[in-house]
Curated annotation (Swiss-Prot):
PANTHER family: DACHSHUND, DACHSHUND HOMOLOG 2. The gene is DACH2. Gene3D superfamilies: Ski. This is Dachshund homolog 2. Transcription factor that is involved in regulation of organogenesis. Seems to be a regulator for SIX1 and SIX6. Seems to act as a corepressor of SIX6 in regulating proliferation by directly repressing cyclin-dependent kinase inhibitors, including the p27Kip1 promoter. Is recruited with SIX6 to the p27Kip1 promoter in embryonal retina. SIX6 corepression also seems to involve NCOR1, TBL1, HDAC1 and HDAC3. May be involved together with PAX3, SIX1, and EYA2 in regulation of myogenesis.
Length: 599
């Protein structure tokens, strides 16, 4: 990588000379591939300002380590510093430019650096300021690391190899499968199948099954199962009759996502119409027997069944069915699709067996006589009774390839009275619409002796299944309405219970307030009684003291009486009465106190 001659950008410890236009609110690297937007005017202004600052400051910093150069790396301009003779580049800048789309984040890069034994250099404050001014790092970042070119190339190679390994592992997990089991389908594969299925096979799903947002998961799963069951049924029927001994794998359908062309070619090579032998002659004879139909190709039901096998448009699903609304539940749709798959597989097996049966080739005995050496397998088949169709039993044995055994077999077939279906003219067949045409594998329409009974039966069964699904949907809707009514009644009951509880709570709160008021009154009366009791106790003490004094005065009177002083007796005549009155008042107070305590 050639280093381009770029201007040297230096800085000092003061950042006053940096223009304000270099600091941006938005990050410069919005995408991994976007280079830093450095115009020549910005670089020149930055250089002039920094040279003026360095001339005025007198070399206050180490200019050797703070000289920033814009070097060319993988076609991008990257900021670099020259330290100890090594060129170091900004690690966050090269991460945004080259590594962001390869790894999960910058922490993954640091983990890889530890594993690779690479030690990045931590930037100084001046270097961080320079890188921030150039826009190499975010405006709010105050830390940065530098890495050499050699270490970056090692890191870039490791990240690229790791991503390639992840992609190869993911592809192997999608494409590989164990015998007898389909490959694991990831979410992305299912979404890709859903996207391609609507374009590659337009008539495979009814428009009623496709919601406004896309194909539902149940419908997608049933459609994939339908394709796989068809392919497996045809491989089972054609396994013994194929000449080259090649069998198609059921998993090819899943590995070839949306590839309708390759799967069509493969089915065309293995279809009973392209098998070598008498059937190929039947096809050409049928083609030769139609001189100019007038540009309106026809298809009988057997050919339509074969088209179903080759994953083409379903004749009964090309138009939206009136019994299939969009709002059907997924369970009913899945059940109906499962039954349709089963019935369709049975119809395809019966159609293929009729193609291989000897009675379908009875009208072409001339072709058999012309090529008597070609092998003609004739498996035995017993058809079940179908409504609206003729009941016939076919009995045949294995026919050898020698001419004598062939003639003997033809004689036995002539002896057995079997009603051979009459070949109908092409005008009596079902005609395609003007917008429809045969695929590339069919050069012209085919004629086979078959009736519409199988398709009618299949359509009748499908209609019945759709009716059942619709009835189930209606029943579920009724159940939902009934549940809604029950929930409403229960809600009303809960509301009534809640209102009753609220009333009871209000009554209880009111009674609580009344009880609190009564309690306050009782406390007030109790306080008054205690005060009265204290007052009475004090009076009692006073009365007792007075009684004591009265007793002492009585003893003094007696002494005076003994001495014979009459005046003192006259003065003290009223003292016994007074003491009796005082005792009576004391008893009254005690009775009042007892009454208060009892109350």
């Amino acid at each position: 990588m050639a280093v381009s001659a770029s201007p040297v950008i230096s800085a000092t410890s003061s950042g006053a000379g940096v223009p304000g236009g270099l600091f941006r609110a938005e990050p410069l690297y919005s995408t991994p591939r976007e280079p830093p937007r450095l115009t020549p005017n910005m670089i020149n202004s930055f250089v002039v300002n920094n040279h003026s600052n360095s001339a005025g400051g007198g070399g206050r910093g180490n200019t050797n380590t703070n000289e920033c150069r814009m070097v060319d790396m993988h076609g991008m301009k990257v900021a670099s510093f020259l330290m100890d003779g090594q060129e170091l580049i900004c690690l966050p800048q090269v991460f945004d430019l080259f590594l962001k789309h390869l790894v999960g984040g910058l922490h993954t890069v640091y983990t890889k650096l530890k594993r690779l034994d690479i030690s990045p250099v931590v930037c100084t404050v001046e270097q961080v300021r320079i890188l921030r001014g150039l826009g190499a790092i975010q405006p709010g970042v105050n830390r940065c690391k530098l890495i050499t070119r050699k270490d970056f190339e090692t890191l870039f190679t490791d990240c690229t190899n790791a991503r390639r390994k992840r992609q190869m592992t993911r592809k192997q997990a999608v494409n590989s499968s164990r015998p007898g089991r389909p490959p694991k389908r990831s979410l992305g594969v299912l979404q890709e199948n859903a996207r391609l299925l609507t374009h590659a096979v337009p008539g495979l799903l009814s428009p009623g099954l496709i919601t406004p947002t896309g194909i539902t998961a149940a419908a997608m799963a049933e459609a994939m199962k339908l394709q796989k069951m068809k392919l497996m049924a045809m491989n089972t029927l054609q396994g013994n009759g194929s000449q080259n001994g090649t069998e198609s794998e059921p998993d090819d359908l899943n590995s070839n996502t949306g590839g309708s062309e390759s799967s069509w070619d493969k089915d065309k090579m293995q279809s009973p119409f392209a098998a070598p032998g008498p059937q190929h002659g039947i096809a050409h004879a049928a083609l030769a027997g139609q001189p100019g139909i007038g540009g309106a190709p026809t298809l009988n039901p057997l050919q339509q069944n074969h088209l179903l096998t080759n994953r083409l448009d379903l004749p009964f699903m090309m138009m939206p069915h009136p019994l299939l609304p969009v709002s059907l539940p997924p369970a009913s749709v899945a059940m109906a699709m499962n039954q349709m798959n089963h019935l369709n597989t049975i119809a395809n097996m019966a159609a293929a067996a009729q193609i291989h049966s000897p009675l379908s080739r009875a009208g072409t005995s001339v072709i058999k006589e012309r090529i008597p050496e070609s092998p003609s397998p004739a498996p035995s088949l017993e058809e079940n009774h179908r409504p609206g169709s003729q009941t016939s039993s076919h009995t045949s044995s294995s026919v050898s390839s020698s001419p004598s055994q062939m003639d003997h077999h033809l004689e036995r077939m002539e002896e057995v009275p079997v009603q051979i279906p009459i070949m109908k003219s092409p005008l009596d067949k079902i005609q395609l619409t003007p917008g429809q045409a045969l695929p590339a594998g069919f050069p012209g329409p085919f004629i086979f002796a078959d009736s519409l009974s199988s398709v009618e039966t299949l359509l009748t069964n499908i209609q019945g299944l759709l009716k059942v699904a619709l009835d189930n949907a209606r029943i579920q809707e009724k159940q939902i309405q009934q549940e809604k009514k029950e929930l409403r009644l229960e809600l009303y009951r809960e509301r009534e219970i809640r209102e009753n509880l609220e009333r009871q709570l209000a009554v209880e709160l009111q009674s609580r307030t009344t009880m609190q008021k009564r309690l306050k009154k009782e406390k007030k009366t109790k306080r008054k009684l205690q005060e009265a009791l204290e007052f009475e106790s004090k009076r009692r003490e006073q009365v007792e003291q007075a009684l004591k004094q009265a007793t002492t005065s009585d003893s003094g009177l007696r002494m005076l009486k003994d001495t014979g002083i009459p005046d003192i007796e006259i003065e003290n005549n009223g003292t016994p009465h007074d003491s009796a009155a005082m005792q009576g008042g004391n008893y009254y107070c005690l009775e009042m106190a007892q009454q208060l305590y009892s109350a």
